[in-house]
């Protein structure tokens, strides 16, 4: 779909899969840039696009989630972050504290290990890295703008309760 002269394209492109991978990477990035109004992925056949999506999901799952191969290592990368959350929550709950909120901003690659460590939803389940796409896709589980909220409050008895929301879902 990208070339009008198929023979010339085959002559210029020595490694077809590498080329498709490069077009996929650029096309994926363009989807995040609305002002470009550019959809490069429409030029890739679905048969070539689908394996790209599978491989990307598998790799990201293996590197950042609770995969059978690397989950313990990935989850440990969130130890300090969780400890920081809990210490700030403890400080906010102390008598006389005026702290109402702590906001943190990060990236999906920081959120995924934290959710695995805490045992939250799909990110707590262990799959093998290869084939993880059969169970979940990155864009479904950790879409752009993903968020995690821990809301601490006291009930009428004075007990501390925590409401946790992942992408606005309890």
Predicted features and spans:
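Signature for phosphate-centric chemistry
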Residues: 1-102, 106-170
């Amino acid at each position: 779909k990208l070339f009008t002269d198929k023979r010339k394209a085959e002559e210029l492109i020595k490694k077809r899969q590498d080329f498709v991978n490069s077009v996929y990477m650029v096309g994926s990035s363009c989807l995040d840039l609305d002002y470009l109004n550019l959809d490069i992925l429409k030029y890739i056949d679905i048969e070539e696009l689908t394996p790209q999506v599978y491989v990307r999901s598998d790799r990201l799952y293996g590197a950042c989630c609770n995969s059978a191969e690397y989950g313990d290592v990935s989850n440990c990368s969130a130890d300090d972050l969780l400890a920081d959350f809990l210490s700030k929550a403890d400080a906010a709950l102390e008598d006389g504290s005026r702290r109402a909120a702590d906001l943190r901003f990060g990236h999906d690659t920081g959120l995924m290990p934290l959710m695995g460590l805490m045992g939250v939803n799909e990110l707590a389940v262990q799959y093998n890295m290869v084939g993880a796409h059969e169970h979940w896709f990155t864009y479904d589980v950790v879409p752009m703008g993903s968020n995690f909220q821990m809301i601490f409050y006291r009930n009428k008895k004075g007990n501390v309760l925590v409401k946790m929301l992942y992408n606005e879902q309890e």
